[in-house]
Amino acid sequence: MTRYNLCMANQAYLSIWLKDFPEDLMLENFGKFLETVPFSAKRPGFTYLEIRALEPSESPVFEQDLRAMPLDAASIVELSKDHLNRDSRYAVRANWDLWVFEGDPAKWQQLPQPIELVCNGELYDEGIWKEDGHFEVNFGFEHLFTGHGGLLGIRQIARPAQSPEEAQFLESMAKPANLQMYQEKTRENIKSLFAWTRKIEEALPVAKLRLWSEGEENFEARMEEILAAH
């Protein structure tokens, strides 16, 4: 059982805007975006594809569960070709490896964690790309990069536990050796996120990037603070 993410549903994201996004290059750029994914060693490949037209309330025009036979980026692009349109949204799911504190008894393990990647056509949902980006990444749980209860970073601003499970976790972090390990594993996760972000910048004609999360006022600055705290 996951010991310390039961009550922490906040997610972490990356929004990406390209310098130009013509329809005839949409899927080509989507493919380049997908090729940057650092797949989980145990669960490589894309496990789901969904294509919607016009707006979120519309039923998918294409939907396929790929868990039985995960696909690579080129295969996802091939499946999407018949539905190329600037009014469409393309979403895929996959897994990447992050350090998590799980098990019974709980211990640090590098395990597959779900991610979602999205391509927003410029006419989809009244131009939602202007707010969310041409491409989006949902990295998963925010706390895998920021920690719990304000424990990590230079400031270490303590916050009260939000559940008995989190209280138990925070109590265990009162031991210096446990807190040190927590810092190290969280920094490893942050480095993985930043490395992937740099890879995206190198693969695409990026105009702007925004790292953000549901629980942090400045997600990128928070991660940089944790990296700087030694």
Predicted regions and their residues:
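Short, intrinsically disordered low-complexity segments
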Residues: 36-122, 176-180
